[in-house]
Amino acid sequence: NDMESLEAQLKKCEPDKVKLIVTDGVFSMEGDVANLPEIVRLAKKYDATIMVDEAHGIGVFGRGGRGVCDHFGVSDDVDLIMGTFSKSFASLGGFIATDKEITNFLRHHSRSYIFTASITPASTAAVMAALDIMESEPEIQEHLWELTNFALDGFRQMGCEIGHTSTPIIPLFIRDNN
C-alpha cells in the first residue's frame, strides 16, 4: 500500500513492456484496504494493467458485497478481478472477471486452469444462492459492519493493540510471551 514505492517501481519499467500491478483489495494480515483510486491513477499514468484479489473484499465492501473495487467505484478501471468462493460464499472454487482477450489467454496458458476439475453444480448453486442473499438482504452486510465496529471498540477499550484496521479482519498484536 506504499504508493511512492509503487510509482518508483513503475518508473523503472521500460515504457513498451507489459506492466502488471497485483494487489489484494483487503490485505489479510492486518485488514488494510488497498488504495485502489491511487493505484488506478498510477496504472493510467504508466500504462499498467491492474489485478485485484478480492478474496477478503467480496461480501464485505461495495454495493451488495461486490468488493473493494466497487466500494471505490473503480471496477471498470481494473483489468482482472479475482476471488474465492470459500470465504463469503461458503463454497468451493473461485473466479476471475476480465475481458475476453485475457480470459482466452488464461484458458490456454494457465496450468492451474488446464489441470483442474470444474466447480461442482452444488457448489455453483451455493454461490448463486449467496449472491442472491447478498443482493436482496443488505442488512446482513450492515450487521457485519455493526459487529466489526463493536469488536474494534471493545478491543480498543480493553487496551489491545489492533493496528489501524477498519475492516472485519482484526489483528491482535501480542508483543511478548507474558
PLM features: residue spans?
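A short glycine-threonine-serine/GTX helix/turn-capping micro-motif
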Residues: 92, 110-119
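Short, small-residue-enriched loops and turns at beta-alpha junctions
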Residues: 3-5, 25-30, 57-60, 113-114, ...
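Short beta-strand
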Residues: 19, 82, 116-117, 160-166
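Active-site phosphate-binding strand-loop segment of PLP-dependent enzymes
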Residues: 1-52
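Structural motif of enzymes handling amino- and sulfur-group chemistry
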Residues: 118-137, 143, 147-152, 156-157
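Active-site PLP attachment segment
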Residues: 70-105
